[in-house]
Every structure is written in C-alpha cells, then in structure tokens.
Amino acid sequence: MASLRKTHPLLKIANDALVDLPTPSNISAWWNFGSLLGLCLISQILTGLFLAMHYTPDVESAFASVAHICRDVNFGWLIRNLHANGASFFFICIYFHIGRGLYYGSYLYKETWNIGVVLLLLVMMTAFVGYVLPWGQMSFWGATVITNLLSAVPYVGTTLVEWIWGGFSVDNATLTRFFAFHFLFPFVILAMTILHLLFLHETGSNNPIGLNSNADKISFHPYFSYKDLLGFAILLVALASLALFSPNLLGDPDNFTPANPMVTPPHIKPEWYFLFAYAILRSIPNKLGGVLALLASILVLMVVPFLHTSKQRTLTFRPVSQFLFWTLIADVAILTWIGGMPAEQPFIIIGQVASVLYFSLFLVFFPLAGWAENKILGWS
C-alpha cells in the first residue's frame, strides 16, 4: 500500500517539494541559501507578529512603544533585536542567493528568476517601510528623502508624493499606512515564494557544472534536508550572536533620537543593505535620472537572461567571465562603502565610476566575454 505522504492531497504536495524531490547530487553549499531565506522569512514573520502586538503606529507614541517593548515586555528586547538583525541576515542571504544565480547561470530559468527579482523588490519595500516604524530621526528623514524621490515623476510627481504621505509631509497618516504595508507585505512575499518554488520545480534545480543532471539525481530527503539543517544551525547561531552581543552594530545611532522634523541629521543614509543602490542614486546629479538609475540597478537583473551569449551555462569553466563576476562583487562592495559616505569629493567621483562599471558589467562586458569565450573554444 502506498504511503500516506504520497497519496494524501496536501501531504503529496509537501512530499514532492521536500521529500521525494529529485535533486542533482553535486549541488554545493551555495544551494543552501534558498532554504535559509525561507527560514529568515518565517523568523521575521514570527518576531514581527509579536512586535506588532505591542507596537503603536502613532507619531506620539511609536518611539515610546518600541522603548516599552525593549524595557517592559517579556523578552521584548530579544524579539526586537532578532527582528532588526534578522532583516540584515535576510539581505545577506538574498545577495548570496542572487550571486549564486549569476555565477551558475540559474537565471536561464527565466520565470523562476523574474519572480525572484519581484521578490527582491518586495523585500526591499518591506524593509524600507519597516525602518520607518520606530519613528527615530533616521526613520523620519529616510522616509522623507526616499518618498520625495517620487516627486521626480513628470507631471504627477507632487500629487503622487502627497498621496503616499496622506498629507503635505511625512506624518501620522504616513506612519499608519507604512505599518499596514509592513504587516501585509511579508504574506505577499510568502505567496510569491510559493510561486517561485512552483516554477523552480517545473524544471528542477540547476547544478554547479550547468549540465543536465537527470541521470544522477537523488532524493531531497534525507541528503539535502540534513545539509540544509547545518545551514540553519550556522545562520541561527550567527543571528543569535549578533542579536545578543552587538545588537546595534548595523544600526544608525541617529535612530535612538525621536523623530524631529525641525532637525535634519548631518548624513541621511539608509540601512547597509540599500547603500549600493543609494550610491547609484546619488551618483547622478539629476533627480529623475537618479530615480531611474536606482530602479535600473535592481531591474537590470531581469535582462541578464536575455544577454547570455555563452554556450556554457555556468562560470565554472569560464575564467574570463569569472574575473568579471568577482569584479562585480568588488564593485558592489565599493558602492556600499560610497553609499555610507558623505556626498563630497573624492566619494562622488568614485561612486560615479563604480556606478558606470556596475551597469557596464551587466550590459556590455558579460555578453562580450561570453561571446569571446565561445570564439576561443571554436564554438561560435
């Protein structure tokens, strides 16, 4: 008789996704990040739910309610620190996951990849509205600066900004709706994640050599379920260590000051995981141009599959493209550093050069390198 997990309508879906899933036998630890992102999402939803039980989305009491959570609620300080630093780990895992996809040509599964890019945008929006909720100085001014960018949209810009604000400045209406969005988006992300997996399981996983692995597949459980558990343990230990030993390491000291519309902080900057995009935004002296570049810095990922010129899928056997890939990683690191620096020389010019290089790598150098490698191998 067939086992219940293979016949029950609900269990069968879980079984096909987590137990009997045929998986390439040679996938490396870089394939762990998908499940780690699932863990991050569940962790963020749970800690966020408990925070929402005690948080007050009102300009008069938001800052005090966060202080109340940290001082008076049972383990509130821990829940808050896990949630704030969990966001950082979420983005670390996302960037590793995207890097893996770029290195091993996973973007050739176009539907899965494009849903992934939409997921990235959703997570970024969620993190942005979440950062506003403690109503500290950087929360308020970050919200003011970033929402103000929409005023660069021709003709309807100002109306659009005031519509999002719910008034003529960032105020109570803004905070209330941002809290509503921050509560809603994670569940949208959860639904999109299921779609992401659905499309992935249509094709099966890619693998480090990028060749068809149908002849050599093994079941996901127990081999990769246990491999994932090791990743879970490492992530949770790292998150707990950061949240317990140095919870404010990645935060901004300005956010310990309650929001004051009359005092502008000397350097307005977002959380570290947005700094690369912020640097690209700032490197263009025109407001609308900067906003378009900011959008393009993420949406450029959507054109990557269409610019794949190589006859090989992965970079495993392509040293020229490998060099370009690591140049891209270094470039993003430089942009992250520049994004946290004041807008003055020499940081402006470094940011502009790094921004041009960022787009050139995606749109020019990677396609050219793929074409050249085909030529060298006599495959063209």
Swiss-Prot record:
Q: Which InterPro entries match?
A: Cyt_b/b6_C, Cyt_b/b6_C_sf, Cyt_b/b6_N, Cytb/b6-like_sf, Cytochrome_b, Cytochrome_b_C_euk/bac, Cytochrome_b_N_euk/bac, Di-haem_cyt_TM
State its cofactor: heme b
Mind telling me which PROSITE patterns this protein's record contains?
Answer: CYTB_CTER, CYTB_NTER
Which residues does the annotation say bind heme b b566?
Answer: 97, 196
Q: How does it sit in the membrane?
A: Multi-pass membrane protein
Entries under SUPFAM superfamilies matching the protein: a domain/subunit of cytochrome bc1 complex (Ubiquinol-cytochrome c reductase), Transmembrane di-heme cytochromes
Give the cofactor binding note: Binds 2 heme b groups non-covalently.
* Family indicated by similarity: Belongs to the cytochrome b family.
Q: What is this protein called?
A: Cytochrome b
**Provenance organism:** Sarda sarda (Atlantic bonito)
Quick one: which gene encodes this?
A: mt-cyb
